[in-house]
């Protein structure tokens, strides 16, 4: 895992077209802005896990 230190207004670049910028820091909460192409999905981890779980569950609809 790469660990970086950034200040408000500073960014991290991933490849040529993804930018993550620190927008604010308040206590233990950090607000990030993500700029990425539309074809790149960006989710919070807990949302991604929920999406993944939903895809893995068998369909139980009536026939």
UniProtKB/Swiss-Prot annotation:
Gene Ontology biological-process annotations: mRNA catabolic process; negative regulation of translational initiation; positive regulation of translational initiation; regulation of carbohydrate metabolic process
A GO CC annotation given for this chain: cytosol
Gene Ontology MF: a single term: mRNA 5'-UTR binding
Subcellular localization(s) per the UniProt record: Cytoplasm
SUPFAM superfamilies named in the record: CsrA-like
Recorded family membership: Belongs to the CsrA/RsmA family.
Protein name: Translational regulator CsrA
UniProt organism field: Haemophilus influenzae (strain ATCC 51907 / DSM 11121 / KW20 / Rd)
């Amino acid at each position: 895992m790469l660990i970086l230190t950034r200040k408000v207004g500073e960014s991290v670049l991933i490849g040529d077209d993804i930018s993550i910028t620190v927008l604010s820091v308040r206590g233990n909460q950090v607000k990030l802005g993500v700029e990425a192409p539309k074809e790149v999905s960006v989710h919070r981890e807990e949302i991604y896990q929920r999406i993944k779980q939903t895809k893995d569950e068998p369909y139980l609809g009536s026939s």
